[in-house]
Amino acid sequence: MPRTLTIQRSTVPSAERANYRARLRVLRSHYSAANCRFWVFEESSLPGAFIEFTEADSEEALTVAHANAPHRILDPSRVYQEVEL
């Protein structure tokens, strides 16, 4: 079964960064407990522009993890599957 991934982009004003980071810690804990991997990157040339990746071993696991997440992503139906090369 191919691994699956969702992507979420966010622009966070500097005044909201502490709240955003706290939310990310909660999400990381949730996805870890759901056997998913969760990464967040910030664009180096545009402070406050973030991209979040959530990965699971199956689309079902990823869908369930998003459905039960404490914070919703904008479009959980946009799921990417790993391509075999």
Q: What is the role of each PLM region?
A:
Residues M1-L85:
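Short S/T/G/P-rich N-terminal loop/turn motif that feeds into the first structured element of a domain
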